[in-house]
């Protein structure tokens, strides 16, 4: 599924988003990963923009897919399909190369430069060394606020039940437009849902949670 995400509670651990992102990137069949500093990227990787200090129109939480990667000694160029319309003029003002507009997406090329100790004290030059996006096969539930996907898979290990407040759970299960799958044990489900029932505030959100869980159970 192209528009799909795994939502995680933590960054680290077996079920953390770092490990899950690595798993899905390794499963990406588009050749070897390109290594840049501490980063690894492949063509076809799902990404989320997370730094808009350099680019006005590549805003925080903008979704994209890497189409091409061109690496040189002093720079790396990414061709990316971003899920928003950016005009050619807007790209020019952001110093991004406009390539095409395809199905409500814009194909762009941006360049990240190698770290240069002689220039990094200059704020504008320092911004050009930052990769402004992260891998996004898996995303933290907190980061997913405001995002929507056709398919959402939520991973809830039994060791993290104390972190699942009603608000966190509500955020996770309402990110989907079509399909929701929750990976948890029956004991974990019971502990979490019974905890929600003891909370007296947020009746509307509790009803939405119950309805979502009924739909998920019915479709599984």
Task: List where the protein language model places each region.
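Core RecA-like ATPase module of SF1/SF2 helicases and allied nucleic-acid translocases
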Residues: 1-220
């Amino acid at each position: 599924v192209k528009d799909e995400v795994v939502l995680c509670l933590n960054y680290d651990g077996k079920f953390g988003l770092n490990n899950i992102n690595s798993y899905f990137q390794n499963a990406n069949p588009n050749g070897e990963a390109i290594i840049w500093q501490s980063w690894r990227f492949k063509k076809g990787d799902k990404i989320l923009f997370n730094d808009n200090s350099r680019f006005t129109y590549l805003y925080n939480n903008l979704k994209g897919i890497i189409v091409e990667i061109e690496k040189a000694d002093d720079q790396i160029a990414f061709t990316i399909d971003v899920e928003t319309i950016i005009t050619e003029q807007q790209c020019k003002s952001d110093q991004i190369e406009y390539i095409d507009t395809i199905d409500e997406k814009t194909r762009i090329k941006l360049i990240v430069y190698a770290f240069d100790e002689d220039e990094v004290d200059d704020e504008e030059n320092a911004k050009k060394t930052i990769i402004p996006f992260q891998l996004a096969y898996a995303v933290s539930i907190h980061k997913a606020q405001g995002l929507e996907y056709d398919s959402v898979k939520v991973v809830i290990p039994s060791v993290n039940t104390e972190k699942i407040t009603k608000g966190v759970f509500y955020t996770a299960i309402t990110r989907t437009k079509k399909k929701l799958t929750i990976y948890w044990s029956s004991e974990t489900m019971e502990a979490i849902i019974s905890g929600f029932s003891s909370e007296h505030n947020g009746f509307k959100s509790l009803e939405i949670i119950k309805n979502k869980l009924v739909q998920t159970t019915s479709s599984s």
